[in-house]
A protein has these predicted regions:
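Residue(s) in the substrate-gating loop at a strand-loop-helix junction
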Residues: 177
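Conserved glycine-rich cofactor-binding loop
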Residues: 43, 50-51
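SDR active-site lid
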Residues: 210-301
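The beta1-alpha1 cofactor-binding region of Rossmann-like NAD(H)/NADP(H)-dependent oxidoreductases
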Residues: 75, 96-107, 139
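Substrate-binding pocket helix/loop in short-chain dehydrogenase/reductase
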Residues: 133-134, 138-146
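Active-site helix of classical SDR
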Residues: 157, 193
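Conserved glycine-rich Rossmann-like NAD(P)H-binding loop of the short-chain dehydrogenase/reductase
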Residues: 65-81
Length: 345
């Protein structure tokens, strides 16, 4: 009888969880006409605009007739994106920037204010990773992850807040990850950096509130694993091509970023998988950590095809991986077909 009651409780519990995730999924919907009109004429700074979420957000902002300051290391690619924005009705300024270098981040801030006189939204989007067993990844590569993902966000956040305090308002958006609550096996330094970004944003938001800057908001966007060039650009010491189960499409994250630039919220897990992961991390932390680690073992160490070790885009930009998405999901489907074919043979 007790087991039956427990099973009934668990069914109801997970049904309620799924309902919560479904009903809170509107943040991933595309902006309506009213939201698009609110963005028109606003100035957005995007550091990490050359691919992935950054490129997706930039191109959408162009369609909504925003002013966009594009910053990343791949200047020629930024110029292409700037042309797309201008052809869509927006305006754009390109600034070459490595977010780990404070003087280059400051140059982005100065260019934005000089050109547009204000910054409404500043987005720290640049990010790198180093995947593999912690003891097999060179220490300098892991430090580089911290240089970009944490120190770079400190430089970007400081530059943004300096502008916002002078003008009296603004929205700072830092891109985090579900890894901030559920550290992922074989992503040790990346998970550490994203946990730090979450706490940086929360602490900064409280400092602004306590000092009377109520019109300055700080947002942390926390996606699930997403099909972007991040996987191609990450340093990889696994011996295979690492991926993740149930990857999301980048448009979900792009839409969430744009929505929260208008209606800021402290922490934004994107989509039902990220929300479920956050819930499990807080309610069933041991179980969640165990399941996530096992999934990572399968998808990032055992199942993918072999690949050579690489430093990816840690130290210098790569030619490959220019789009918003990177076709990871399609490659996974093809790999599954090949495995099934080999089993039959």
């Amino acid at each position: 009888m007790a087991i039956k009651t427990l099973l009934q409780f668990m069914r109801g519990f997970f049904a309620a969880l799924l309902l919560l995730c479904f009903t809170t999924g509107c943040s991933t919907w595309k902006l309506g006409k009213s939201g698009q009109n609110k963005i028109a004429g606003k100035t957005y700074v995007i550091i990490g605009a050359s691919s992935g979420f950054g490129r997706g957000v930039a191109e959408e902002l162009g369609r909504y007739k925003a002013n966009v300051v594009l910053a990343a290391r791949r200047t020629e690619l930024l110029e292409e994106i700037a042309d797309t924005i201008r052809n869509s009705g927006g305006t754009a300024r390109v600034v070459t920037c490595d977010i780990s270098k404070p003087e280059e981040v400051q140059r982005v801030a100065e260019a934005a204010v000089t050109q547009y006189g204000k910054v409404d939204v500043w987005i720290n989007m640049a990010g790198v990773g180093a995947i593999g067993r912690f003891w097999e990844i060179p220490a300098e590569d892991q430090v580089r992850v911290i240089d970009v993902n944490l120190k770079g966000f400190i430089y970007g956040s400081r530059a943004a807040v300096d502008i916002f305090i002078k003008q009296g308002y603004g929205v700072l958006i830092n891109i985090g990850s579900v890894d901030s609550e559920t550290p992922l096996a074989y992503h040790a330094s990346y998970s550490a950096s994203k946990a730090a970004v979450r706490n940086l944003s929360l602490a900064l938001g409280q400092e602004l509130r306590l000092n009377g800057y109520k019109k300055i908001k700080v947002v942390t966007i926390e996606p699930w694993a997403v099909d972007t060039p991040w996987w191609r650009h990450a340093a990889n010491y696994t011996g295979v091509e690492p991926k993740m189960a149930l990857m999301d499409e980048p448009d979900k994250v792009v839409n969430a970023i744009l929505r929260k630039s208008l209606r800021p919220k402290k922490i934004v897990p994107v989509g039902w998988k990220a929300k479920a992961s956050s819930f499990m991390a807080n309610v069933f932390p041991r179980l969640n950590e165990h399941i996530t680690a096992n999934v990572s073992q399968r998808y990032q160490m055992e199942m993918p095809p072999a690949a050579p070790a690489t430093q990816g885009a840690l130290y210098k930009p790569m030619e490959e991986g220019k789009g918003v998405d990177d076709g990871v999901d399609e490659r996974m489907k093809e790999e599954k077909k090949m495995r099934n074919k080999q089993k039959k043979e």
